[in-house]
């Protein structure tokens, strides 16, 4: 995978280790779901059990088109090609990859980034392609769907991992995100599912348990005072 603005490429394995411990040992689990799948920084580290269902959703239609098509990018594109793709909304799958891959700080179509060293850029590109190919080999039947998290409101006996836009942060989202509504949804879903949520902090009135935390450097923020945060994984109880 390539990076994703606010994504979990660097710490995905740590989060997946917590989830896998439950996934591997609870025979009542019927499936695994990520309503904010992004570039699958956590998902790619989740264990594959052939007898359960794997779901992934995101509000970005280009991104879902890219994953659903199972297309594999073959070339590094130039700035003019990138700009042309930005204005061509018909090329959804390509936009779903290059928009983030070449976007500055991996924010979709934000500026243009390509490493000035040709060999290092080639290595960066091939590394992303290898991760994409590995994901499709590992999860050949994963089901991708465009929409917000509420499309999964009917799930029962699933593990649901959510990486929403963080409250009071500058993470990109296609529309204003209602954190309070999301928190209520998580509480409701936890009655019949196992729900995990990534965040820096949550409101004091939520009785959620921290099951993992790690100090990280925040590469998405523009305020130097916000560059170091503690990433936390909560179990919704």
Residue ranges and their predicted role:
Residues 32-46, 56-61, 101-104, 146-149, ...:
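Conserved proline-anchored active-site loop of SAM-dependent methyltransferases
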Residues 174-237:
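Long, positively charged, glycine-interspersed low-complexity recognition regions
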Residues 1-4, 168-176:
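Glycine-rich phosphate-binding "P-loop"
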Residues 37-41, 130-131, 198-203:
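Short, polar loop motifs at secondary-structure junctions
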Residues 20-24, 151-157:
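Short amphipathic alpha-helix with an adjacent loop that forms part of the alpha/beta core around
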């Amino acid at each position: 995978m390539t990076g994703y603005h606010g994504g979990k490429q660097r710490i995905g394995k740590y989060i997946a280790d917590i989830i896998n411990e439950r996934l591997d040992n609870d025979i009542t689990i019927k499936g695994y779901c990520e309503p904010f799948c992004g570039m699958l920084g956590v998902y790619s580290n989740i264990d594959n059990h052939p007898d359960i269902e794997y779901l992934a959703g995101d509000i970005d239609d280009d991104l879902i088109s890219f994953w659903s098509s199972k297309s594999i990018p073959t070339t590094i594109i130039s700035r003019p090609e990138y700009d042309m793709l930005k204005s061509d909304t018909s090329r959804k799958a390509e936009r779903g990859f290059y928009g983030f891959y070449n976007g500055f700080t991996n924010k979709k179509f934000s500026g243009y980034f390509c490493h000035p060293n040709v060999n290092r850029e080639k290595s960066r590109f091939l590394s992303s392609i290898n991760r994409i190919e590995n994901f499709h080999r590992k999860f050949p039947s994963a089901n991708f769907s465009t929409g917000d998290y509420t499309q999964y409101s009917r799930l029962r006996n699933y593990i649901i991992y959510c990486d929403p836009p963080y409250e009071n942060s500058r993470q990109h989202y296609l529309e204003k995100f209602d954190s309070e509504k999301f928190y209520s949804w998580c509480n409701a879903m936890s009655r019949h599912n196992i729900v995990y949520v990534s965040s820096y902090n949550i409101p004091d009135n939520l009785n959620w348990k921290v099951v993992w935390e790690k100090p990280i450097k925040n590469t998405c923020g523009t305020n130097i005072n916000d560059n170091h945060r503690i990433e936390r994984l909560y179990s919704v109880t």
